[in-house]
Amino acid sequence: MKNKLLSAAIGAAVLAVGASAASATTLSDVKAKGFVQCGVNTGLTGFAAPDASGNWAGFDVDFCKAVASAVFGDPTKVKYTPTNAKERFTALQSGEIDVLSRNTTWTINRDTALGFNFRPVTYYDGQGFMVRKGLNVKSALELSGAAICVQSGTTTELNLADYFKTNNLQYNPVVFENLPEVNAAYDAGRCDVYTTDQSGLYSLRLTLKNPDEHIILPEIISKEPLGPAVRQGDDQWFDIVSWTAYALINAEEFGITQANVDEMKNSPNPDIKRFLGSETDTKIGTDLGLTNDWAANVIKGVGNYGEIFERNIGQGSPLKIARGLNALWNKGGIQYAPPVR
């Protein structure tokens, strides 16, 4: 889900706190406390959710673990702060969390007015619609007059209004502040349609009483580039978070996996040796403020991008989401990482 721009007054006040939080070096603060504090969803299956024992798992959670692996060489050195759509930005601005990894859309307002840095996109998504099969609806263009469940304070809510206005359709919004309330209302039949990011619809469908009775319509009505965010003002930390994501993507392209990473250190390919820190003259890790084997530690800790995708939300998961745009650039998608050299 995606929060609207906070009011100017609140944003300005919190930005002042955020600027102070970013004035210190985030990396040194993280090392001093011994863990990365990561903001995640309160519970979205496949992306971030605790199990019965309270252990967090999911696509966004694995990115938090990847950052911890880059910094400490240990994916367990991370603590999670569950945040809802409204709390997430304040938590990041205030310094309560070090990085936000919570299915959050990169927009111009968030990148500028809120004082965040987004990069790179870890999941290309778009807003969709879920309906009951019994409605016999095949397209979102057939939804005029429908009651639509949506979370307030989100760009989902704004996109919905724009789409129906553009297509001269009428609808009745059924709005709730918290995601569990939206889920319960749709499951109870208080609305005909549920709208949010399409990946979220796949996840939320699993929680319904009768998941097989619901379908996701083909229309994607928005661009939702999702990825981690950090506070502006600390370029080193921004680089570490960014290159952690790029390392995951590059590793998949190189064919480096969690199982073969040590073996690949002996590859004759100088790009791979440089990437894994086994090239004797490499300074790539130290330039980031990390050890030269930081990328190897990331892959040891969580695997490559493809492994993370498949086990959490792909064909190896209950969601079974196709890679689509999130396939590598040379395999029909648009996931692309700059070279490590």
Swiss-Prot record:
- Source organism, top-level taxon: Bacteria
Q: Name one GO biological process term.
A: L-glutamate import
Q: Which GO terms describe its cellular component?
A: ATP-binding cassette (ABC) transporter complex, substrate-binding subunit-containing; outer membrane-bounded periplasmic space
Which N-terminal stretch is annotated as signal sequence?
A: 1-23
The disulfide bridges present are none
- The main location is periplasm
Effect of inactivating the gene: Reduced uptake of amino acids Glu, Asp, Ala, Leu, Ile and Val by bacteroids that lack this gene and the genes braC and braC3 or braE and braF from another ABC uptake system of branched-chain amino acids. Pea plants inoculated with bacteroids of either triple mutant are defective in symbiosis; the plants are yellow, have increased numbers of small pale pink root nodules, dry weights similar to uninoculated control plants and 30% acetylene reduction compared to plants inoculated with wild-type bacteroids.
Enumerate the UniProt keywords alphabetically.
Answer: Amino-acid transport, Periplasm, Signal, Transport
Entries under InterPro entries matching the protein: Bact_solute-bind_prot3, Lys_Arg_Orn-bd, SBP_3_CS, Solute-binding_3/MltF_N
Q: Name one GO molecular function term.
A: glutamate binding
Supply the Pfam families for this chain.
SBP_bac_3
Q: What is the annotated localization of this protein?
A: Periplasm
Gene3D superfamilies in the cross-refs: Periplasmic binding protein-like II (3.40.190.10)
Q: Which family does it belong to?
A: Belongs to the bacterial solute-binding protein 3 family.
Q: What does this protein do?
A: Part of the ABC transporter complex AapJQMP involved in uptake of L-amino acids. Affects the efflux of these amino acids as well. Essential for the development of bacteroids, the differentiated legume-symbiotic forms of this bacterium, and for the effective N(2) fixation by them.
Subunit field text: The complex is composed of two ATP-binding proteins (AapP), two transmembrane proteins (AapM and AapQ) and a solute-binding protein (AapJ).
Q: What is this protein called?
A: General L-amino acid-binding periplasmic protein AapJ
